[in-house]
Amino acid sequence: MQAPKFDKFKKYFNRKKASIDEVVRELTAGGIVFRRNKAGEIEILLIKDPKGRWSIPKGHVEEGETAQETALREIAEEAGLKETEAICWLGKTHFRYRRLTTLVLMTTQIYLVKALNPEERAQKEEFYEEIKWFAFNDALEAVEYEDISKLMLLAMKRIRHAGH
């Protein structure tokens, strides 16, 4: 009796991913946007992306723009909030992903941003599924990325310390 031939399986399992031909760095910036509701409680703005993940408004830094300017521009574009103020820099996150044969190394600068007009209505960009103001603890629970969660805790500490 002959052993079964596993040539088809060998071909399948021996396939390798295409090699990385290029490594690119992308700089992005965003903001943890907060406001006080009518009861005086802190609320955090989150946006749900097309994959159903809650996160903060953020995007690519354009030429000639500072990271802080990018954060405020992205908040205006993605959330429709024009009356905002960057309070302070909170930190940065690092993320990497593969785009075919390119390895993308993304660094995102995150700012604490205050919505100056609590009556200004947040309006999502067409690209996003949903936009919503969350109570702080609910936002912390909803956000998908651990590094953003950690910066949200720092944001709350800064908000309380500064009396915003």
What are these regions (language model features)?
Residues P50-R53:
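Short connector loops/turns at beta-strand edges and beta->alpha or beta->beta junctions
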Residues P4, Y12, E141-H164:
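Charged phosphate-binding loop/patch that engages nucleotide di/tri-phosphates or the phosphate backbone
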Residues L45-K48:
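Short, acidic/hydrophobic/Gly-rich beta-strand patch recurrent on exposed beta strands
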Residues S55-K58:
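A short gly/proline-enriched turn/hairpin at secondary-structure junctions
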Residues V61-K150:
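Unchanged
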Residues M1-N37:
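Acidic, metal-coordinating catalytic segment for phosphate/diphosphate chemistry
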Residues N37-E43, L100-L103:
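Short, solvent-exposed loop/turn segments that connect beta-strands within catalytic domains
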